Swiss-Prot record:
Enzyme Commission number(s): 2.7.1.23
Catalytic activity: NAD(+) + ATP = ADP + NADP(+) + H(+)
Protein's name according to its UniProt entry: NAD kinase
Lineage: superkingdom: Bacteria
Cofactors named for this entry: a divalent metal cation
UniProt source species: Latilactobacillus sakei subsp. sakei (strain 23K)
InterPro entries the UniProt entry points to: ATP-NAD_kinase_N, ATP-NAD_kinase_PpnK-typ_C, NAD/diacylglycerol_kinase_sf, NADK
One Pfam family per UniProt: NAD_kinase
């Protein structure tokens, strides 16, 4: 089995990554950062997001494992003190995995008609620097609304527990093949109206944004930021690709939600 260990730059994460790498080598595993079959992320959810984008072109050949060195994350199933148990699980590997949906984003630029394609594991946002975002919103071919406000966020089910939740979005179970559109401080008055509620779209529908002609847009795709390009349109749909996680043990999704946002049931 070809494995790579992908770590953030924190000292504790580097120590765990070095320890894990040495144990993997000593147990006969092949370390291969170019064409891995398993990518082990050491850090938190942000580190796993970075690992996902690093290997996004080979998702059909890779399973991910998350080792967290801080707080419990939604993508990390192993703690930093469980390195020995993880190595044993890898030795007993039977190829078991669980997959989650991803978001496919197509951005068409107004100045050059250039088209860029991206995958997102968590969410995509569209804003302007310091002015109101104005964009027409289409669901499939049908016009839905004209949005005015600070911005819009489109998230995956797993991303629904991240930024989307903080702006009033619903929490979606990752078994749902769906994406969610959430407004960021929309303007609603006698002149301008939006739905003013999150929208959940199934996998056979897509979302199209056609913003006003200006160049001061800020687009975020997971942890990446793109600025200062005039955007003709942005199209969102559930991607054909999926992210695969090695399933040696898997924390129940609602247990993750409860632990992250409510606190231990045993403390009540």
């Amino acid at each position: 089995m070809r494995i790579t260990v992908y770590s953030n730059d924190g000292s504790s994460s580097r120590q765990v990554a070095d320890k894990l790498t040495n144990k993997l080598i000593n147990n006969g595993f092949t370390m291969d950062a170019q064409t891995p079959e398993v990518v082990i992320s050491v850090g938190g959810d942000g580190t796993l997001l970075s690992a996902f984008h690093r290997y996004a072109d080979a998702l059909d050949q890779i399973r991910f494992i998350g080792v967290h060195t801080g707080h419990l994350g939604f993508y990390t199933d192993w703690r930093d003190f469980e390195v020995d148990d993880l190595v044993v699980a890898l030795q007993e590997d039977l190829g078991q995995s669980i997959s989650y949906p991803l978001l496919e984003v197509k951005i068409t630029y107004a100045d050059t008609n250039e088209v860029q394609h991206f995958l997102a594991l968590n969410e995509v946002t569209l804003r302007r620097y310091a002015a109101t975002l104005r964009t027409d919103v289409y669901i499939k071919e049908n016009f839905f609304e004209s949005f005015r406000g600070d911005g819009l966020c489109v998230s995956t089910p797993t991303g629904s527990t991240a930024y989307g939740k903080s702006i009033g979005g619903a929490v979606l179970h990752p078994r749902l093949e769906a994406m969610q559109l959430t407004e960021i401080a929309s303007i609603n008055n006698r002149v301008y109206r939006t739905l003013a509620a999150p929208i959940v779209l199934p996998s056979d529908e897509w979302l199209l944004l056609k913003p006003s002609r200006t160049s001061d847009y800020v687009v975020t795709i997971d942890q990446f930021t793109f600025k200062d390009r005039p955007i003709e349109s942005m199209q969102f749909k559930i991607a054909k690709e999926r992210i695969q996680f090695a399933r040696y043990r898997h924390t129940h999704f609602w247990d993750r939600v409860e632990d992250a946002f409510i606190g231990s049931k045993h403390e009540i």
